[in-house]
Amino acid sequence: MELLIKNARIIDAIQDFKGDIYIKDGVINEIAQEIKKDNVEVLNCEEKILMPAFIDTHAHFRDPGLTCKEDLESGSKAALRGGYTGVCLMANTKPICSSKEVVQYVRDKSKELDLIDIHQCISVTQNFDGKTLDHLNEFKDDNEVKAISDDGVGVSNSNIMLEAMKIAKENNWVLMSHAESPEFSKSDMRIAENMMTIRDVELAKLSGAHVHMCHVSTKEALKCIIAAKDEGANITLEVTPHHIGLTKEINDYRVNPPIREKEDVEEIIKAIKMGNVDTIGTDHAPHTLEEKSKGSPGMVGLETAFPICYTKLVRENGVSLNELSKLMSLNPARLLGMNKGRISIGVEADLVLIDIDKKIKVDSNEFVSKGRNTPFEGMEYYGEVLATIKSGKIKYKK
């Protein structure tokens, strides 16, 4: 399989130049200002932006068990339409991903579909019971496991969380923290996030584990995490497109953690500009319209992430496309131990072609995700994904 990409503006975390890319056997084989090859498939970019495909550090595909909301195929196709070729899936499936059987189902189905790379999180506690860690022993020799998380509920018992962090460190896993203190969940969601953030940061320092703080949304939590990172703690910091693109004044859509105040959004953008944020994760969380009408928290995000982030960060706040690529591609690849997220000879050819000058209007009827739950309906942003390439094959083309 050969593909020649012509006339692209090539951008990754450190590069920005015009040129061609030749892909052979799924890998970037040659990069130059001009490449000529006979009898190969050609993609003419017409000077549009070509970036490393995005990798989502935080998504929910609801498969197995909740496939009325999403499944591995629909979620993967939504990812491709949004420019993503890799996702890290949370464990809140049905049954919860606490067993080898569930993990193997996801892996086998993913390979059968052959659409994107899927990394399935293991639950921190068995079946989210908040106390049992024995199931983690099953995965100690499984090199495909990258991360563990009780995302959606969190781990309220501090001793259990510390022990889980120690296990994660022993196995070189990332522990993904959903920072929410249950004591405050019903009364004050700001305090709920802040209190649990403080605890998990301190436990991360104590254990030495790599702790990934998911969907950080308050200015206080940001300050706490950044201070710990500055001290050398092995912590990475994730924010979402909706916590960048919305404030309570614009749309108080139900999501967990909630849409925050203007000052919180300003601090998130400031942290990004200062280089203190590591990844952008969509927290793609599809629901049926019936469930959403009853108050289920969450929104779909894979198909709108880039235009929201590009518009809000690059166009409106002066963040470079290089930095955005770092947040959406390079750093997520590093987090998950993937040889991706950059444009270099010998790297797997996962790429996305984007028209950054094209204005789009969000229309949930055009989503390929089963989910239609979005607060961005009818809003306009810049940046349209034209094509997504996975291992040198064009998997999505508008």
Curated annotation (Swiss-Prot):
Cofactor(s) in the UniProt record: Zn(2+)
GO cellular component labels: cytoplasm
GO molecular function terms attached to this record: allantoinase activity; dihydroorotase activity; zinc ion binding
Active-site positions on this chain: 283
Domain of life: Bacteria
Pathway field: Pyrimidine metabolism; UMP biosynthesis via de novo pathway; (S)-dihydroorotate from bicarbonate: step 3/3
EC top class named in words: hydrolase
Reaction catalysis annotation: (S)-dihydroorotate + H2O = N-carbamoyl-L-aspartate + H(+)
Residues reported to bind substrate: 60-62, 92, 256, 287, 297-298
Family from the record: Belongs to the metallo-dependent hydrolases superfamily. DHOase family. Class I DHOase subfamily.
Function statement: Catalyzes the reversible cyclization of carbamoyl aspartate to dihydroorotate.
NCBIfam families: pyrC_multi
Protein's name in the database: Dihydroorotase
Organism from which the protein derives: Clostridium botulinum (strain Eklund 17B / Type B)
Gene that encodes the chain: pyrC
